[in-house]
Swiss-Prot record:
Top-level enzyme category: lyase
Cofactor or coenzyme needed: pyridoxal 5'-phosphate
Family per record: Belongs to the class-II pyridoxal-phosphate-dependent aminotransferase family. MalY/PatB cystathionine beta-lyase subfamily.
GO biological process annotation, one example: methionine biosynthetic process
Pfam family, one: Aminotran_1_2
Name used for this protein in its record: Cystathionine beta-lyase PatB
GO molecular function, one term: cysteine-S-conjugate beta-lyase activity
Protein's job: Catalyzes the transformation of cystathionine to homocysteine. Also exhibits cysteine desulfhydrase activity in vitro, producing sulfide from cysteine.
Amino acid sequence: MNFDKREERLGTQSVKWDKTGELFGVTDALPMWVADMDFRAPEAITEALKERLDHGIFGYTTPDQKTKDAVCGWMQNRHGWKVNPESITFSPGVVTALSMAVQAFTEPGDQVVVQPPVYTPFYHMVEKNGRHILHNPLLEKDGAYAIDFEDLETKLSDPSVTLFILCNPHNPSGRSWSREDLLKLGELCLEHGVTVVSDEIHSDLMLYGHKHTPFASLSDDFADISVTCAAPSKTFNIAGLQASAIIIPDRLKRAKFSASLQRNGLGGLNAFAVTAIEAAYSKGGPWLDELITYIEKNMNEAEAFLSTELPKVKMMKPDASYLIWLDFSAYGLSDAELQQRMLKKGKVILEPGTKYGPGGEGFMRLNAGCSLATLQDGLRRIKAALS
């Protein structure tokens, strides 16, 4: 795969490239914000989709045992996690699954714990369903985030807390939570009867030899209180095909989740999503290995550029994913000023840190899922914005 090739995405109804005027008021800025990559999907996926297209019939379609076997094989081979096929259900996306989980495992007025700064839809899916957010803010230690377990225990002990949403690896920072962290977290949730929804959508994109630990893999007790959200969308750049696998080992919890899907008129996956998830998880490994090597090269380039050209910008080097969490607070700019500098002076679009809740002030998220040349262009634009 030639990851250096710069693919043209303008005019393809791309949110990242074609909505910049509507969303940011600029049309001449380089988009490095929303979390999809500028790479073509693996040939294994595109060829499978062509074959499905050539069949020419697109009636009602449902994932079957073959689809579940592909998910199980992937989890076993990539993460050492033996998943029971019966525990798998499917959703059009992880955000949809978050909403379904909130409806299934909480009541209106309940509190849901999240760890800011964190992925924006966590807030939306809780609040739009009439539940309340309770923050367990992450601590910054030695250039990375850490969990405040003392505060977490206090929050989980509140009887109105019924759900905890974990982001592992963490978005926006790329922090991969350690086995020890997950064990402590899981024991607290068990003790207080709190269900854990673990968003593990970035878990296939582990960098620099880091290994992902699925929360539900740690014990049967943890599995029984867990809902794991996985998907090939970030891994293989197929978010537009809308396919995710939701792993719920406990039968009663799985039934509640399925009832939420049905109540909202959501059934199965579309025909191309089924084909894509099977091809991705059964044939996508070699392509992913190449991608990870390339993303590591991009991360190293960003780190080197920032250290020499913009030493006041602090980069949280990620354990996983193609996203970079950048701290611009040393410049003393307000978040609005920082955003306007990027848009108007630098002509580059980053994701504002304030979108991720408390603790995101002064930060912006950079998407390095692009060619090295595009990344270098973006870094030069950031420098221009701050000059």
